[in-house]
């Protein structure tokens, strides 16, 4: 994994998904020692399985720039995490059949209220098979993309109706770490 990170940095990547606290600690130590660029960020995957405030406090102390809590946390559980950390939460709103399937679109105004700053995630698609080039046609993939965009539009409108005081990030906020071209 470390060799992959180093190669991706050479290609311009500035954000990395990390699944393990030990790997997070090692990468952050490398960053502090200037073995990795200062502008690199580490986001903790949902597969790390963090579901409480103590776990997120640990992630923040290890250098996480953001973290994905497990997908089915209640509003009070999300609020408890928010009460102890300042890092953005990456919260899954739509999961498809390949990951158990659920839809929390109508909860997004309240999730944003208790968990902001947060990013909402809709992934990965109709199934892991879509990542195989022979699994779905280009037209099907394009339609899936349009549906995700429609969901995002609906979420933004819903939050604006229920909690107009909340702000939605502008396109391409700096903390997303869009790759830089070298």
Regions inferred by a protein language model and the residue ranges of each:
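Short beta->alpha connector loops at strand-helix junctions that form conserved
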Residues: 70-71
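Short, glycine/polar-rich helix-capping loops at beta-to-alpha or helix-loop-helix junctions
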Residues: 51-55
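Non-catalytic positions within long, well-ordered alpha-helices that form the structural scaffold/packing
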Residues: 9, 60-61
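Short, structured coil segments at secondary-structure junctions
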Residues: 62-63, 85
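Active-site pocket-lining/capping segments in soluble small-molecule metabolic enzymes
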Residues: 1-13, 17-50, 75-182
